[in-house]
Amino acid sequence: MTRYTLYGRPGWGSVLIEAQLDALGLPYDYREVPDLFKSDEGRRALAPLNPLSQVPTLVLPDGAVMTESAAITLHLADASGRDDFVPPPGHPARPQFLRWLVFLVANVYPTFTYADDPQRFVQDAGAAQAFDAAVGAYAEKLWRTVEAAAGAPWFLGERFSALDVYIGTMTNWSPGRAWFEQ
């Protein structure tokens, strides 16, 4: 295999990796999976590659499988041979890049998972509404934190990076999965 294979779904987290593959000029094939929350078939098809049946799932040119968007981001930067998308080790921007990459995927990203379908996590309708409101308030706090740390014109100041792909994508994920399905 000389190309990557990205398993994804339009509007889901795989779009982060799809955008990076495109930006870095890395060749790949895209395999769309069904809605993994609604399709047993989709989960079964993806499970041999990713036991959690989540996207993004990326098969590398050598056949190895990667999951977790932050890890994939770092791998793609290394594999591309470019140092303009992810600050390389030793670059003064590297520590802040890593901090905010992990912040986005560990803190902000999950708020979309919870807010898209709160009743997946809380069955009682009243409790689901309260949960959804709490997640929304927390997401706003997280985005204010990101905004306060952002440079200009890009997150790291004069340097465009993968963080800008994450932020640009994630700030446009509303109104949620139902909208993307249309």
Q: Which role does the model predict for each range below?
A:
Residues 1-130:
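GST-like domain detector, emphasizing the conserved glutathione-binding G-site
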Residues 101-182:
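GST-like fold's C-terminal all-alpha helical module
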